[in-house]
Regions:
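C-terminal motif of bacterial Sec signal peptides marking the signal peptidase cleavage site
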Residues: 20-22
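Terminal, low-structured helical/coil segments at or just beyond the last alpha-helical repeat
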Residues: 27-36, 45-53, 191-221
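Alpha-helical segment of the N-proximal tetratricopeptide repeat
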Residues: 57-96, 100-103, 107
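Structural signature of tandem alpha-helical TPR/SEL1-like repeats
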Residues: 74-83, 107-120, 142-154, 177-185, ...
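Structural marker of alpha-solenoid helical repeat scaffolds
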Residues: 90, 124, 158, 192-193
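Canonical tetratricopeptide repeat
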Residues: 100, 134, 168, 202-203
Length: 221
């Protein structure tokens, strides 16, 4: 029960980050960019045809996908699932929609089913780094911390300065009891973005570190 409570607090924080930056959902995962990364396979299909009907379908699909991301950021998981499903119905090869639906499904209480969708998203588009982040979060929700850590690491292979993937790894090491690595990774995250200090100081992952001299120095307690 305690682990589940801590995980929910972790997820709520990351949804706030998503709402502010779009990380892992509708934005490029590069921490210093905010341009949209929501182009789906349906958009590409629509651009290759002059048929008005196909163009209209593409617009509607984009609307569903955008609505799904907005609902997810707002914590409206059921709506996010419904909108992503509508997007998938219009294009069964829309990997981004599968990724969003998978994350929403996991947050809605079915991490195993959510993982099926995020894996499908990877099969459809193995180069979608945003889905790597979602995979990491879904594995974390399922308690598979080593798998989660591997997917955060895959994000960092493409984007070494992705603050919240670095921080995600720090929290995993903290939860696993590896204090040295937890603080090493926390220090890396803080060097990328100093706002991590206040986050780490307040999150339960690092609550037991509050008397740790190195931790106090890192976060300024």
């Amino acid at each position: 029960m305690i682990g589940e409570f801590l995980m929910k607090k972790f997820v709520l924080f990351f949804l706030l980050i998503i709402a502010l930056t779009g990380c892992g959902l509708n934005q490029n995962t590069n921490s210093n960019k905010t341009e949209s990364n929501a182009t789906s396979s349906a958009t590409a299909t629509g651009s290759s045809t002059s048929a008005a009907g196909n163009s209209q379908a593409t617009t509607k699909q984009d609307d569903h996908l955008i609505a799904a991301k907005q609902a997810l950021s707002a914590g409206e998981y059921t709506k996010a699932i419904e909108e992503a499903t509508a997007s998938i119905k219009q294009d069964a090869n829309n990997g981004e929609a599968y990724s969003v639906r998978g994350f929403a499904t996991a947050l809605n209480g079915d991490a195993a089913k959510g993982l099926t969708d995020t894996k499908k998203a990877y099969d459809l588009d193995p180069n979608n780094v945003a889905n790597y982040y979602n995979m990491a979060m879904v594995y974390k929700l399922q308690g598979q911390l080593n798998d989660s850590k591997q997917w955060f690491a895959k994000v960092l292979e493409k984007d070494p300065s992705n603050t919240w993937s670095v921080y995600g790894i720090a929290t995993i090491y903290a939860d696993q009891g590896d204090d040295t690595k937890a603080l090493d990774w926390l220090e890396k995250a803080i060097k990328i973005d100093s706002s991590v200090k206040s986050v780490a100081a307040e999150q339960d992952h690092f609550e037991r570190f509050h008397n740790n001299r190195r931790f106090k120095t890192l976060v300024g307690l």
